[in-house]
Amino acid sequence: MWKYGQNQGNQGPAGGGGGAPNMMPMGGFMQGGGGMQGGGGMQHGNMPQMHMTPQQQQQQQQMNMMGGPGGMQMNPNAVGPTGLMPGMSPQHQMQQQQQMMQGVPMSMPPQQAMQQQMMGPQQGLGMGGSSGPQQQQQLQQQQQQSNLQQQQQQHNVGSGGAPGAGGVGNNMLAISQPNPHKEINIVQLSRLGQETVQDIASRFQEVFSALKNIQPTSHRDNNTEKKVQEYFRTIRLLFKRVRIIYDKCNDAVMDYMNAESLIPYKDEPEPRIETSQCDEYRKVLQENHEYIETVKLKNRQLREIIDRTRIIIWEINTMLAMRRS
């Protein structure tokens, strides 16, 4: 097989383009060479079997049988399927063939494997006119990209898992340095302040419970003392946070006005507004007054008539009584 690989390496320039003969002891296929791409597209089944021992010819026939009835055709952007086991399942063989053709190792993460599979055809197309250093540069760029992605993921995980006072300090910085392009929502600030006050109350409960568990002995527990100090440090930061929220809310709302100044208090009732008197209204009102005076006069006259009539009747009755006597 070593000799077979050498024969293929020597036949590379005849196909057109002269690539580097990267020999593989057990596979017999070259990785990069213009001879595989140019010419008539060299096929493994049509390789001349000169300078080959019968044992090597038999191994080549077995490889042709594994590749299919038409023989394995050399792919310009792939490495030959080396190391296929006859006892493997067809699916496993296909996966190994694809991985070997794309040049992806088995231990690579899926992101790098996908990147190399996408870059594989581009590398294969440029094999006839490109050399080995360009492929190495592309591989180095891919490795740098994958390293950057891993560093970003680690940084995100590290920044998201910082509990306690560090998270409170970050929130304080976010509140104290708001985005000028974003408007401050008073409702959200009020809700954040309410949550902060509840957090302060819960921290005080934890402090009281920790102080309650301390026993008045000569040997004090340093862990409890450190825990209480940490609680007080967190409470101090939370109070600063509440103060910042309070200042932001006061700046966003209008000035305070007393409620009594907004309510109009009046001791005396307002005078009634007189209706405008037109000429017709005045005439009717004057006629009404005249009618009232006329009625009063008639009433006085009727009263005088009644009084006179009563006196006359009284005199008539007196005269009749005097006559009978």
From Swiss-Prot:
Keywords: Activator, Nucleus, Transcription, Transcription regulation. Residues 1-26, 109-176 are annotated as: Disordered. Transmembrane segments: none annotated. Belongs to the Mediator complex subunit 30 family. Component of the Mediator complex. Component of the Mediator complex, a coactivator involved in the regulated transcription of nearly all RNA polymerase II-dependent genes. Mediator functions as a bridge to convey information from gene-specific regulatory proteins to the basal RNA polymerase II transcription machinery. Mediator is recruited to promoters by direct interactions with regulatory proteins and serves as a scaffold for the assembly of a functional preinitiation complex with RNA polymerase II and the general transcription factors. This is Mediator of RNA polymerase II transcription subunit 30. It comes from Drosophila pseudoobscura pseudoobscura. The lineage of its organism: Eukaryota, Metazoa, Ecdysozoa, Arthropoda, Hexapoda. The gene is MED30.
